[in-house]
């Protein structure tokens, strides 16, 4: 057991060993906890009714606040049970909306999320970040705003960042690629601004 001392006060930390998230002991502990949790959840007699009710409550159209960029109007919309909201664009307030970017099309299981969006100063390009399966790691892509065509390059190992445009490029922060097997273990240190 680990005990830290803060200003003369001992603070036990009996679960510090769980911070080693790739150890066999941590994996065994997680497996045992999952077994207990799943056994409890499986025995709830009204579980299916609860799921149906929650699904019914979540199944309504959701529309985000519109925003204007370079003379066009953008807004997010979810038809009800879509995994991710879709970004739409329209040329005027009463114009017809069309899909600008649909993150649901970026994976089969709907777990790719659009995490940030930034337009170049002239509006020609759109930089956006995505994360996969709830990870803090992001990838940055740049597309032609008018055509939706992706530029060739994209950036991996970004985290907690978006694109800050300046003239014909943008700033962002990223990390060195983590060692294989340590993708979800690294602390947030030594990020770089590009």
Where are these regions (language model features)?
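Beta-propeller folds
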Residues: 1-194
């Amino acid at each position: 057991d680990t005990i830290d001392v803060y200003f003369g006060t001992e603070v036990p930390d009996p679960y510090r060993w769980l911070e080693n998230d790739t150890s066999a002991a941590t994996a065994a502990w997680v497996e045992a906890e999952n077994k207990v949790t799943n056994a409890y959840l499986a025995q709830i007699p009204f579980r299916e009714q609860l799921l149906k009710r929650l699904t019914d409550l979540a199944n309504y159209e959701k529309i985000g606040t519109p925003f204007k960029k370079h003379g066009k109007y953008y807004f997010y919309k979810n038809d009800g049970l879509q995994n991710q909201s879709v970004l739409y664009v329209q040329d005027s307030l009463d114009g017809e909306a069309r899909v600008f970017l649909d993150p649901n099309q970026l994976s089969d299981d709907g777990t790719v999320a659009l995490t940030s969006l930034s337009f170049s100063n002239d509006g020609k390009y759109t930089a956006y970040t995505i994360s996969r399966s709830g990870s803090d790691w992001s990838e940055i892509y740049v597309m032609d705003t008018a055509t939706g065509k992706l530029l060739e390059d994209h950036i991996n190992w970004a985290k907690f960042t978006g694109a800050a445009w300046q003239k014909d490029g943008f700033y962002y922060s990223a990390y060195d690629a983590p060692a294989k097997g340590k993708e979800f273990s690294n602390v947030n240190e030594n990020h770089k601004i590009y």
